[in-house]
Amino acid sequence: MIQMQTNLDVADNSGARRVMCIKVLGGSKRKYASVGDIIVVSVKDVIPRGRVKKGDVMKAVVVRTAKDIRRADGSVIRFDRNAAVLVDNKKEPIGTRIFGPVPRELRGKNHMKIVSLAPEVL
């Protein structure tokens, strides 16, 4: 459950380390984002010689949340930290690698490129 002002880790090699959510896309009154949703983020912390700079405003896909994800079979999946992958306007990842596992729910929300780059799909 991601809302405005939430800090997230970046799970790709785009050059950003931490980002902060500044808007949840998908409706004027929408308050929260979950796995697979697109948010607008501001880059807060970067590594040297990365593709993005501190202060850049970008779009990102939420790939891991600390809040439970309930599945149709009754199982629950949750992660230790919130994480996102930076994407361009065509919803393609900016980085070329994804770090850490991603949930199967991304496949249903048409983020196939992120699923294919991930080392593990839960």
Curated annotation (Swiss-Prot):
Part of the 50S ribosomal subunit. Forms a cluster with proteins L3 and L19. In the 70S ribosome, L14 and L19 interact and together make contacts with the 16S rRNA in bridges B5 and B8. InterPro entries: Ribosomal_uL14 (IPR000218), Ribosomal_uL14_bac-type (IPR005745), Ribosomal_uL14_CS (IPR019972), Ribosomal_uL14_sf (IPR036853). It comes from the Bacteria. One of its GO terms (molecular function) is large ribosomal subunit rRNA binding. This is Large ribosomal subunit protein uL14. Belongs to the universal ribosomal protein uL14 family. GO terms for biological process: translation. NCBIfam families: rplN_bact. The keyword Nucleotide-binding does not apply. Signal peptide: none annotated.
